[in-house]
């Protein structure tokens, strides 16, 4: 799967599904599920590294985990899910040259075929434009941007007229810059619908309603492995309880042997 193929999905009204992964096991599960995109998100900071936010995760962490995820893939490379790696905090906010260097390290040192960048402030737009000119495909991310939680909090964005219009403008700008898709996180459903209608590139929602061209979920949230669940992700199983009880049963049984 190449990034450019996702536009064809939108034209055919074919739903796009993305799952996150952080190691070879979760990568294998995500790929075998039939997900079109496997995202190595900086959410791994909380999912598997124990941090309280995405901010502490480093470029080295992202490269390490992206390589681990790719080793879980079993299909030929042209048949694999599209592997996308998040650019972590302060790898693209510190100037275009550094951003190109860091994104280049991701693409050169992993099997990722694209990077994801949060936000659309003028400086970020300059970085995105430069990366795309250098041949690095970019997925945008608007709405609730976790790397900006110190300013914005973990709350829904776009729910007043000013932020509503800003997110729409930013989405159009990212498309014009050449992003191949945009993640819309935790915004009102009708705003997501407006953006989906106006853009030619696909929108991939998380907590943005049913009108996006696709959906992305943190796999650990779907499997019920986290103590705290986001309000927009209902687990498909209570994984922490199920697996925890089974492990307790095994440990207790082994102690009796």
Swiss-Prot record:
Protein's gene: panB
Gene Ontology MF, one: magnesium ion binding
Q: Which InterPro entries match?
A: Pantoate_hydroxy_MeTrfase, Pyrv/PenolPyrv_kinase-like_dom, Pyrv_kinase-like_dom_sf
Question: Where does the protein end up?
Answer: Cytoplasm
The family annotation for this protein states: Belongs to the PanB family.
Report the principal subcellular site: cytoplasm
Give the cofactor note text: Binds 1 Mg(2+) ion per subunit.
Q: Name one GO cellular component term.
A: cytoplasm
**Active site per UniProt:** 185 (proton acceptor)
Specify which residues bind 3-methyl-2-oxobutanoate according to the UniProt entry for this protein: 42-43, 86, 116
Role of this protein: Catalyzes the reversible reaction in which hydroxymethyl group from 5,10-methylenetetrahydrofolate is transferred onto alpha-ketoisovalerate to form ketopantoate.
Q: What is its EC number?
A: 2.1.2.11
Its pathway, per UniProt, is: Cofactor biosynthesis; (R)-pantothenate biosynthesis; (R)-pantoate from 3-methyl-2-oxobutanoate: step 1/2
Q: How does it assemble?
A: Homodecamer; pentamer of dimers.
Q: Specify the protein name.
A: 3-methyl-2-oxobutanoate hydroxymethyltransferase
Q: Which cofactor does it need?
A: Mg(2+)
Report the catalytic activity: 3-methyl-2-oxobutanoate + (6R)-5,10-methylene-5,6,7,8-tetrahydrofolate + H2O = 2-dehydropantoate + (6S)-5,6,7,8-tetrahydrofolate
Keywords linked to the UniProt accession = Cytoplasm, Magnesium, Metal-binding, Pantothenate biosynthesis, Transferase
* Annotated PANTHER family: 3-METHYL-2-OXOBUTANOATE HYDROXYMETHYLTRANSFERASE (PTHR20881:SF0)
Q: SUPFAM superfamilies, alphabetically?
A: Phosphoenolpyruvate/pyruvate domain (SSF51621)
